[in-house]
């Protein structure tokens, strides 16, 4: 076993403190929880298809350049809240680009750590009846912990099984279990984030993530009005 502590700063201001732990591969019991039965990604709508229908510069940019394909089981939160509040979310994700076979596990795991931040707080939004375009919302990651249990293939479909056990005082807690396409548990993640709305006491309005006027009856896949 070994550990390494990393500190990052920008223009003299500390922006990150990270502690990483390592272990050499060794023999031992191989047990994990079972992945839930959910619709396969081939039967779900890609976020790329949704972005390409939205007349918004950020959406158009993501529709062309997003490095990962995301497919929500319960429906996405890009344009409107979920019809029913829930603290649970399932989604599939994989890289859009082919990953060379010789790519090391260091790269695969780094990419998973990078991309999971895009969706980790979505169960918090879902439980509060919010979406990425909720007017005035302010959101930021505060703390993040991640464990890698098995090898990761970021070029294959990964299933995120997420929940949010608590929200209070402008902070929300989220957890995720990440399974590979064969059902193996490859990673466990926990993250706390700031999720604030202008109705919260003493909170200034944020920018939200989308400023789009939607037509009545729009299901999130049609062009906004």
Protein language model annotation of sequence segments:
Residues 1-225:
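Terminal targeting signals and extreme-terminal segments of soluble enzymes
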């Amino acid at each position: 076993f070994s550990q390494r502590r990393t500190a990052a700063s920008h223009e003299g201001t500390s922006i990150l403190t990270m502690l990483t732990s390592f272990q050499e591969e060794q023999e031992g019991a191989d047990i994990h929880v079972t992945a839930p039965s959910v619709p396969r990604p081939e039967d779900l709508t890609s976020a790329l298809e949704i972005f390409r229908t939205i007349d918004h510069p950020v959406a158009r940019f993501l529709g062309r350049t997003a490095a990962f394909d995301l497919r929500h089981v319960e429906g996405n939160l890009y344009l409107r809240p979920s019809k029913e509040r829930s603290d649970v979310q399932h989604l599939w994700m994989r890289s859009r680009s082919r990953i060379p076979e010789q790519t090391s596990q260091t790269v695969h795991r780094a990419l998973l750590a990078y991309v999971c931040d895009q969706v980790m707080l979505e169960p918090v939004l879902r439980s509060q009846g919010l979406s990425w375009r909720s007017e005035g919302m302010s959101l930021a990651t505060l703390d993040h912990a991640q464990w890698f249990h098995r090898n990761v293939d970021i070029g294959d479909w990964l299933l995120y099984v997420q929940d949010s056990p608590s929200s209070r005082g402008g902070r929300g807690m989220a957890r995720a279990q990440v399974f590979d396409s064969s059902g193996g548990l490859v990673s466990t993640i926990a993250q706390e984030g700031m999720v604030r709305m202008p109705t919260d006491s003493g909170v200034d309005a944020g920018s939200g993530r989308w400023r789009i006027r939607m037509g009545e009856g729009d299901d999130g896949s049609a062009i906004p009005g």
